[in-house]
Amino acid sequence: VSQTPEHAVHEQFEEQLPEHQLADFLLTDCGNICSLTGQAFDTNPLFWLRSMDCAGRLAPAEARAEARVWPDDTWQDAFKRGILLSSAKITPLERRENITRLDVLSPQIPAPVRPLYQLWRDGQTSQLQLAEERGRYGKLQQSTDAELDTLRQQQQFLRDQLDTTTRK
């Protein structure tokens, strides 16, 4: 049985460390995060994560106003816009339009950002599914309420008939 010397294990571990370090945006002021542009920001998932965090802190009206500033002709601007609007209590139709627009631009999203984008997109899709389920539940509730009303009316009619028959 051969054992690997400890220094060989340590060397293997060191080889697995990433070559590039990423800037951390945890302390970046939310008021400035959207103004940061360039490849160093666009390819850094921590930048996008901080953007999501900052967008989540905005009031819905403020998020909508900020989103209007960003066009959606590049993946970066469309993603910023989508992130802002996702916190703005948008309608399912608006959410679907954002997802569709970003789907068109998603092949341009760099590999380091793609997993974060996919998680964000999955969350947006879940929000759409939730809205659809709520809609179905609402329709089912209305239909059930209508059926119950009909049954109550029938029950009352039958009771009235029973009372009439019993009196005779």
Predicted features along the sequence, with ranges:
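N-terminal globular core domains of eukaryotic regulatory proteins
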Residues: V1-T125
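Long, leucine- and charge-enriched amphipathic alpha-helices
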Residues: S126-K168
